[in-house]
Amino acid sequence: VNVDVTHRLLVRIAAVAACVLPIVASSAGPAAAAPALGPGGAPAIVVPAGVTAAVAVYDRSTGTFTEQRDTALQVRAASVVKLLIALDYLWNLGPDYTVPAADRTRFDAMLRGSDDAAASAFWSRGGGAAIVTRMVGRLGLVNTAPPPAGYPGYWGYVALSAADTVTIYRYILDSAPARVRTLIMDNLRAATRCASDRYEQYFGIPEAFTKPWAIKQGWSGFGTPPPTVCGAVAAAGAADASASAAAIDLTSGALHSTGTVGAGDRAIVVVFTLHPAGTSLVTARNALTAVTRSLRVPGAAAAAPSLWVGTWGSGVRVRTGPDTATAPVGTVPTGGDVRVDCQRRGAEVVAGGYRNDWWAHLPEFGGYMTNIYVRTPGNTIPGVPEC
């Protein structure tokens, strides 16, 4: 097996497996269970223990909400606030809303790749917190506020609620000038898997539902997580810094998925989640996607289930089939996180005293890696179906 894992690392992993593996196993998320029922007999929203979730799903066809949970709760918006930054920038460009070429590059990067430098440029040009004040008045937002005192430059610390986020999307889709709607929604539909800071941003809505969808994601408070197929994540910036107590929670990990799902942008979906400080990004991703999958979203088609898992070792090959004799198609980032959509038996691999004939399928690579190098308590990954 061409995995280039040192003997020292294997011995260390074996020695601490008893205490490490039960901990990392929890990152796979809750095991499947019969759905609980909420008021009126409808399936309840799934919220893993320890997670704070604010949720809203709005059906544009009927003008009604199909899901609501803590919709007035103020959370730090992280990159979801880029919707307000974009709207404020476009507000005075009418009547044709032509964006200068240099600004268009920044504008597209801010929405497609969640580029922080672009957002900071527009934030500064627009007067910082004044952007939020203007947009609150223009859209009639009721639970949105500028960053707390002492953090004027931290646009990611803007307070936003699920209800107000639905209002923002409803304005873009139903009331904004057609050119404004096109400029924003075309970018959200073209959101890239890898953000500008190399976060993998296809969590929540993109993991839970098949296209068509359009997304604006947000993340803050996870430091520098393990690498993914997108590479090593850049250091935290202005949207993600340490903070003391404030009117909103600035210390918990924040992971949000917002956007539209279905033909004609039928459903507006907003899922804000907060996670205890120290929660790994892989655990938070699985929790957020579990919440999103449990929602009643009109016009949506469920995507195949998948989970994020941690790995160990270096030089771990991904192959075309579950066998070391098949051709390699890539290499897992050293100690990185990977998404697994199914697992199957294949050729047995023996390494460092471990034996395992189970292989995990990694959809982003289009191939299989041996489960030996997946952080899981046994030969198989809990919660992942067989291929």
Annotate each PLM feature:
Residues 1-34:
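Secretory targeting and sorting signals
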Residues 67-72, 113-118, 147-153:
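Flexible glycine/proline-enriched surface loops and loop-helix/loop-strand junctions
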Residues 330-378:
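SH3/SH3-like beta-barrel superfamily modules
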Residues 87-95, 167-174, 339:
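Short glycine/serine- and small hydrophobic-enriched flexible loop segments
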Residues 302-322, 329-334, 344, 379-387:
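SH3-family beta-barrel domains
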Residues 94-145, 161-162:
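Conserved catalytic neighborhood of penicillin-recognizing serine enzymes
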Residues 74-98, 110, 269:
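Active-site SXXK
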Residues 36-54, 58-62, 127-304:
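Penicillin-recognizing serine hydrolase domain
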